Amino acid sequence: MYAVEAEMVMKYERPLAAPHVGAWLGYPADAKVLLVHADDMGLCHSVNVATLEAVKGGMVTSASLMAPCDWFVEAVELAKTYPEGDWGLHLTLTCEWKTLRWRPLAEASAVPGLLDRHGFMHRSVLDVAAHATPAEVETEIRAQVEHALRLGFRPSHLDSHMGTLFATSEFFEVYRKVALDYGIPYMAPRVPPAGSSPVETALYRRFATYTPQLVEAGEIVHDYLQTDTGGQGLEERIAYWADQVRGLRPGVTQFIIHCGQEVDELKAITGSYRSRTWDATAWQSPQLRHVLEEEGVILTTWRELARRQPRWRGGVEPEIGE
């Protein structure tokens, strides 16, 4: 007990000396540690159900909920039925859909820059960056955390829908500030991902200038982040993810997936309903389970990573109350 604690404190004092975050957190230097994380719970009923089923399956190890969405309350209630799950808060400043629209939780007069001409959230990250102030962003993300807490839900971590909180250095600073104020770990990879779009790639590359100081401060809990996906059809999707698992590097990696069901509700929202169904099914398949075992991958959660991280050990246990 004491030897382990002493070793972790020693590593905390010299985190940049470790070959990767995983080694600093106490994993073997050659260990491939993986978070499989489902975004967008709260978007709609079918996404909620599909995400819960995937998390219960065991290979999807974490998920995050969107507080401004109409189905957020149901998402929290479903999370309460499975407290063993690892549930975070997907801080949301955009609403990209054509017919499904939501508004900020903060008073409109307090966050005018977050509103489009119809009073909804902007559809794009660039619009948020062009119109919103850091103060407005902070007001809104605090409102989302407070809304979750009022519902008896203390998230295991915070992350950012569409990467909006990485759009400017000022947005990132308020994201970090709110996380530290509440004592909740926040998603920030040591190595920026290639991403699935030029905009996303640019966002994370801008953030990369911060990573050494964040590692040194003990706030980074994973090395690599993968936000894109591939493969048309279920079999190709399984093969795609199998290849990604086989290509894992030593350290802590987070895969981001999106779960859904092929039902009319989700079809009415997005043309990517099939892709969400493929992700949900792939990550409950025996084929991927076999590849994970074959590659010796260690599946983990945000809670476990935070427990290993001296910066967050004091307040990581999520609470899902009545």
For each of these PLM feature ranges, what is it?
Residues 51-57, 72-86, 103-116, 149-150, ...:
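Acidic (Asp/Glu)-rich catalytic clusters
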Residues 1-35:
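N-terminal pre-catalytic segment of deacetylase/amide-hydrolase enzymes
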Residues 186-187, 269-322:
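C-terminal domain-boundary segment and adjacent tail
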Residues 33-35, 60-64, 84-90, 155-159, ...:
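Structural preference for beta-strand elements that scaffold enzyme active sites
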Residues 39-41, 66-68, 90-96, 161-163, ...:
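Active-site beta-loop-alpha junctions enriched in small/polar residues
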Residues 25-98:
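Active-site beta->alpha N-cap acidic-glycine motif
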Residues 102-129, 272-274:
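Active-site gating loops and adjacent loop-to-helix segments of metal-dependent hydrolytic enzymes
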Residues 134-219, 231-237, 246:
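Catalytic domains of cell-wall/extracellular-matrix polysaccharide-remodeling enzymes
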